[in-house]
Amino acid sequence: MASYFALVLNGISMVFSQGLFPLYTIPDHLGPWTPIDLSHLHCPNNLYTDASYCTTEQSITYTELKVGSSVSQKIPGFTCTGVRTESVTYTNFVGYVTTTFKKKHFPPKSRDCREAYERKKAGDPRYEESLAHPYPDNSWLRTVTTTKDSWVIIEPSVVELDIYTSALYSPLFKDGTCSKSRTYSPYCPTNHDFTIWMPESENIRSACNLFSTSRGKLVRNRTSTCGIIDERGLFRSVKGACKISICGRQGIRLVDGTWMSFRYSEYLPVCSPSQLINTHDIKVDELENAIVLDLIRRREECLDTLETILMSGSVSHRRLSHFRKLVPGSGKAYSYINGTLMESDAHYIKVENWSEVIPHKGCLMVGGKCYEPVNDVYFNGIIRDSNNQILIPEMQSSLLREHVDLLKANIVPFRHPMLLRSFTSDTEEDIVEFVNPHLQDTQKLVSDMDLGLSDWKRYLLIGSLAVGGVVAILFIGTCCLRCRAGRNRRTIRSNHRSLSHDVVFHKDKDKVITSWESYKGQTAQ
């Protein structure tokens, strides 16, 4: 099955070079019709082949691209941004601690980014802890600054690898490209001065693991090499081939766009810039696989139909539709006319719209003109009904185009936040928007009173302060009582002194007596 996958992909390479898989194929001209027997029916060869008259064969080992490989290789990676968080604490006299957090950038190193990515990938809690604020230290009546470095990993970040030049392309990079070709642990600077891009795999050359080794036969004539028969038995001519390197490996590009690498000593020109393998068009592997699966399904249906025809000995118009060639090129056309199975040589061309085949009612366009049926029978199962409507079986089952439309509609790539805006110049003090969702918010914290003591010391201090307060209250109260008692004694003494010096008036005479002694003397008289 894998070999047939590769064979079919090689066969439709020319079709892809011209565009998507065709909606339908129809002959642009038909040869004369010839009666054939049922045993002459055969399923079409939907592969590109070439004829050669060379006879000398030599077994060789060659290298080819893996099935589904594309010139535009997707390299999964991640971005790493250096963020330094500072916590500034100040403890005042009574123990209040004020903490302020500040963030700024620093240029990260690839080694540290790789370690942070491995921790995040493994679910190591140390990565999440590194994004948290640093545990702030404090000292009484001092300002303490604590710093903590974080490496913010954002993934996925997918870039494109050019297998011709090994350059990386992405809008993340400065000038859109990164040409560093280091083998181990490479990194690329980005539009942000403090962010670098790194691949998920340390060895970026592993992304060029596009090759597979096969065995085939080198076909030669007496003078030169004619081509190579690959392991699937398909002859590949070297006529029109040119030299081209893929991921540093020298090889040749065949005329149909196939790349091979084998020992070839004859002269070949270097491929021009327009002669690239599959060009630079991005082809989704799922799209190619769906088309290949549909081709294989149709070939199996054709073989089943052929087996049914041979065993039953009967054929119908519907069954003849399975023998139509699905890709442009030379093939056969079949019809069932007047009870006779007919065959004609035909050259098929692609059809992208049904209007190209049926421009108006009753007209089947072949070779630029309306093809005349025989008894309302055309070829390859196409007939005309009584209402002059042309019926094509594949118009009801165009699965190939449905695959294309569905796959294109369902591809939603991840958009790295750096792609949403451009970053040209940033300072260390500015934290860019795409990093903020991964970090804690900067904030200012004020703690409760804390003298930096343990619990028992804190309780001892509180008890000592309480006892000291009681003693102070008692002392102040005692002092107040003593002061009041002393004040009262001084008041009494002053009153006694004032009485001894008071002036006495005699009631009989208006004579002033200046003292008690003089009063006693006067009364004695």
Curated annotation (Swiss-Prot):
Highest taxon in the source lineage: Viruses
Pull the Virion surface topological domain ranges from the record: 18-459
Q: Report the PTM annotation.
A: Glycosylated and palmitoylated by host. Glycosylation is crucial for glycoprotein export at the cell surface.
What industrial or biotechnological use does the UniProt record describe for it? Primary surface antigen capable of inducing and reacting with virus-neutralizing antibodies. Almost all human and veterinary vaccines are based on the functional aspects of the G protein.
Residue positions with a glycan: N221, N338
The membrane topology noted for this protein in its Swiss-Prot or TrEMBL record is:
Single-pass type I membrane protein
Where exactly are the transmembrane stretches of this chain?
A: 460-480
Signal peptide start and end residues? 1-17
Q: Does the keyword tRNA processing apply?
A: no
Recorded hits in Pfam families, A to Z, give: PH_Rhabdo_glycop, Rhabdo_glycop_CD, Rhabdo_glycop_FD
GO cellular component terms, A-Z: membrane; viral envelope; virion membrane
Where would you find this protein in the cell?
A: Virion membrane
Its keywords, alphabetically, are: Glycoprotein, Lipoprotein, Membrane, Palmitate, Signal, Transmembrane, Transmembrane helix, Viral envelope protein, Virion
Q: Which residues lie on this side of the membrane: Intravirion?
A: 481-525
Summarizing the function annotation, the protein's role is: Attaches the virus to host cellular receptor, inducing endocytosis of the virion. In the endosome, the acidic pH induces conformational changes in the glycoprotein trimer, which trigger fusion between virus and cell membrane. There is convincing in vitro evidence that the muscular form of the nicotinic acetylcholine receptor (nAChR), the neuronal cell adhesion molecule (NCAM), and the p75 neurotrophin receptor (p75NTR) bind glycoprotein and thereby facilitate rabies virus entry into cells.
What else is on record for this protein? Its mutation dramatically attenuates the virus.
Describe the family membership recorded for this protein in Swiss-Prot or TrEMBL.
Belongs to the lyssavirus glycoprotein family.
- Quaternary structure and interacting proteins, as annotated: Homotrimer. Interacts with matrix protein.
Record's protein name: Glycoprotein
- From what organism does this protein derive? West Caucasian bat virus (WCBV)
The record lists the lineage as: Viruses, Riboviria, Orthornavirae, Negarnaviricota, Haploviricotina
Primary gene name: G
